[in-house]
Amino acid sequence: MKALKVPEATITRLSVYSRFLERMDRNGIVTVSSGEIAEGVGVSSAQVRKDLAYFGEFGTRGVGYNVKDLMHYTSKILGLNEPWPIVLAGAGNLGFALCTYKGFNDRGFTIVGVFDNDLTKIGKKIVDLEVYPPERMPEVIAKHKVRIGIIAVPARAAQEVADQMVKNGLQAILNFAPVVLNVPDHVLLRNVDLSVSLEVLTFNLVQKESQAG
């Protein structure tokens, strides 16, 4: 089956649509129009229709979309129709926040192992997860058939952690460390740098002020 070439922005919006549809379903809404989705998530109705068109034909002209059906389809497209076990490297403040974030479980993502090389953290628990030394990562990955890893360690340790994850068969990495990682082409890598996001905001604020002044 040929892989779809879909813009990343479309995938991001699809995730937002999926959450919106879940809220509609919880509120007992049966059908929804592209205009209502657009208003609910802050895009145009044309954008909603264009995004969905990448994946097929949905809904009925003049009627709209069945909420449960579209919710099912978007979840399936995003791969959320199956559980996703995850390993997390880093038991510091960020690691703790990630472990206690309920949104992961709500979307089918479950952290099954937390690892740190800090002897003061090893053996302690975050919620119901014991912090393991890095040497136990292969065991946990194999046991739970893990394909995704999260890196929440200092920049100086991130590449070594990424190498260990790749060596043990992980196929995708979400990296919170503020450093460029080198991984093989077959490994999916997504970087999340909170400082960069803040700098984008400060840039736009400065531009807005200069235009106003």
From Swiss-Prot:
NAD(+) binds at G90, A91, G92, N93, L94, G95. It comes from the Bacteria. GO terms for molecular function: DNA binding; DNA-binding transcription factor activity. Residues 16-55 bind DNA. It is found in: Cytoplasm. InterPro entries: CoA-bd (IPR003781), NAD(P)-bd_dom_sf (IPR036291), Rex_DNA-bd_C_dom (IPR009718), Tscrpt_rep_Rex (IPR022876), WH-like_DNA-bd_sf (IPR036388), WH_DNA-bd_sf (IPR036390). Keywords: Cytoplasm, DNA-binding, NAD, Repressor, Transcription, Transcription regulation. GO terms for biological process: negative regulation of DNA-templated transcription; response to redox state. GO terms for cellular component: cytoplasm. Modulates transcription in response to changes in cellular NADH/NAD(+) redox state. HAMAP family: Rex. Homodimer. Belongs to the transcriptional regulatory Rex family. This is Redox-sensing transcriptional repressor Rex. It comes from Pelotomaculum thermopropionicum (strain DSM 13744 / JCM 10971 / SI). The lineage of its organism: Bacteria, Bacillati, Bacillota, Clostridia, Eubacteriales.
